[in-house]
């Protein structure tokens, strides 16, 4: 995580916590008021609670031109963006997608096209209807990794996030109470 983004979010969160004018606006403020000092994990949690509705920004008397220049939604959005890149699996793909998204999409489309071409050119389908073009086994070979890898990536990202925010192990009693 970028230290300067966290420091700015921490500065603004501490001012907001002292003011508490916006305490009923969204789920960020009850979580904000639960702490007096904010760790990096706390700020990451607050950033991911914020939906960037900007209600607190428009109500705040400490936005520019005030010397505090508060813009909590922007500070939290920057931390949230950085956390998404940090927790993505694989990390290199999370960072690259922000800068080279079109290239990644084109590479993915080209990769799927090559898989379909290879399945059609290398294996005789031998079936009826659509299976005469592409066999069931070829479809499973193509789409099973395309289904499982995102689930695996989400699980890794969620685990990284949960460790960063200091989440406790989830138990069945937590799920019942939710």
Question: What do these predicted regions represent?
Answer:
Residues 1, 12, 21-26, 56, ...:
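Extended, hydrophobic alpha-helical segments in both membrane/secreted and soluble proteins
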Residues 6-15:
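Local sequence-structure signature of Cys/Sec-based thiol-disulfide redox active-site neighborhoods
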Residues 15-35:
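N-terminal cofactor/phosphate-binding cores enriched in small/glycine residues
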Residues 2-7, 37-38:
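Short helix-capping and inter-helix turn/linker motifs at the boundaries of alpha-helical repeat units
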Residues 13, 34, 38-178:
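Iron-sulfur-cluster electron-transfer modules
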């Amino acid at each position: 995580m970028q230290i300067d983004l966290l420091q700015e979010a921490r500065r603004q969160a501490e001012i907001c916590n002292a003011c508490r004018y916006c305490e009923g606006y969204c789920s960020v403020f009850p979580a904000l008021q639960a702490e007096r000092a904010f760790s990096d994990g706390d700020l990451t949690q607050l950033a991911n609670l914020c939906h960037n509705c900007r209600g607190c920004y428009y109500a705040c008397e400490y936005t520019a031109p005030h010397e505090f220049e508060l813009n909590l939604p922007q500070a939290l959005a920057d931390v949230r963006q950085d956390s998404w890149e940090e927790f993505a699996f694989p990390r290199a793909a999370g960072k690259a997608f922000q800068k080279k998204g079109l290239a990644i999409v084109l590479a993915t489309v080209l990769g799927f096209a090559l898989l379909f071409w290879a399945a059609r050119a290398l294996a005789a389908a031998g079936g009826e209807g659509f299976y005469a073009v592409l066999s069931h086994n070829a479809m499973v070979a193509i789409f099973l990794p395309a289904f499982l890898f995102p689930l695996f990536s989400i699980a890794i990202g969620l685990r990284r996030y949960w460790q960063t925010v200091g989440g406790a192990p989830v138990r069945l009693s937590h799920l019942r109470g939710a």
